Amino acid sequence: MRELSAIHAWQAADPSVEIVNVDFVSGAGAVVERFEAARSVTFDGGVYTTVIAIRNMNSDRAARRLLAQFGGSASISDGGFNDVDYHSGEPWAPTDWTISSDSDSIEWFTDTFGVDPNANALRWSTMYTFWFDSTADPTMATYSLDLFKPGSPSSVTIPFSGMSPVIFTDGFESGDLTSWSSSTP
């Protein structure tokens, strides 16, 4: 794990964790800014639990919103968030991001740069964690990250593969063996 960010330790401990880079060129400059995103999905008793960690590698523009958009109806619950506890006179607001969900999406967000330049954005060299439960397969959702400081682009897509890291989805992992028989193992 030497010379890698801490987010890679999660994948070393759990090989089902998917890590992707979210790169973009900010404005007309040639500077590539990068976020790293990792996702873990588990399935138990008809409910998917998704955990997402996002690390700001070098983006001065920071991030202010994460959106998971499902293609259809989903029952979404137990959304959570973990951030950095700023201290020692840091000017950044310590306010947790707001969590909002409806029938086909869940989002976490803080104020825009225009409202509060010191809002609790996902700033350079920090990592925030987000999680939720859903009845719809979260590997089929589209994930996007809105940037905090104004500029182009204003949002970037997180390129998770769309492939489910869940190996078995036939109901047996829940302990329900009612559809199993000796003729059809």
Give the ranges of each region predicted by the language model:
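Short beta-strand elements of extracellular/lumenal beta-sandwich folds
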Residues: 38-60, 64, 70
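Extracellular carbohydrate-recognition regions
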Residues: 166-182
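Edge beta-strands of extracellular beta-sandwich domains
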Residues: 154-162
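Low-complexity, intrinsically disordered segments enriched in Ser/Thr together with acidic residues
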Residues: 109-141, 147
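Low-complexity, acidic Ser/Thr/Pro/Gly-rich terminal tails and inter-domain linkers that flank the onset
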Residues: 2-45
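Solvent-exposed beta-hairpin/edge-strand motifs
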Residues: 63-94
